[in-house]
């Protein structure tokens, strides 16, 4: 299981990596392949800053809502190459990170004692 504190750290790391991925992996072409991870990464950083867990600046969003956003983002990232039609250009980073995001959601401890 992943503690809530570890999940918080993972959120910030994944958010930054998603923003940088198109530039580091060579698909910063201005299309959906580039913008989907950038926007999802920025979203992760923003809602992580206001989630009710350690390492946030305001405790506004409950963990359950945060995990729902993570799951939705992971699923969108996973299917985005086919949904937005760029699978012929690049698909593996989106699929790998999408699956990892879903796995982190499933393995995160949800009880407050685990925080």
Residue ranges and their predicted role:
Residues 33-66, 103, 107-112:
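A low-complexity, Ser/Thr/Gly/Pro-enriched, surface-exposed linker/loop concept
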Residues 4, 84, 101-115:
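Membrane-water interface at the C-terminal end of transmembrane alpha helices
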Residues 2-5, 28-32, 54-64, 85-88:
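Juxtamembrane loop-transmembrane helix junctions in multi-pass integral membrane proteins
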Residues 79-93:
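Membrane-helix boundary connector in multi-pass membrane proteins
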């Amino acid at each position: 299981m992943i503690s809530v504190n570890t999940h918080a750290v993972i959120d910030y790391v994944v958010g930054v990596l998603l923003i940088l991925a198109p530039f580091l992996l060579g698909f910063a072409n201005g299309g959906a392949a580039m913008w989907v991870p950038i926007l999802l990464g920025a979203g992760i950083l923003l809602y992580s800053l206001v989630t009710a867990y350690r390492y946030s600046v305001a405790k506004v969003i409950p963990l359950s809502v945060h995990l729902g956003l993570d799951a939705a983002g992971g699923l969108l990232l996973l299917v985005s190459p086919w949904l937005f039609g760029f699978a012929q250009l690049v698909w593996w980073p989106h699929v790998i990170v999408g699956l990892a995001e879903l796995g982190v959601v499933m393995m995160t401890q949800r009880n407050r004692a685990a925080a």
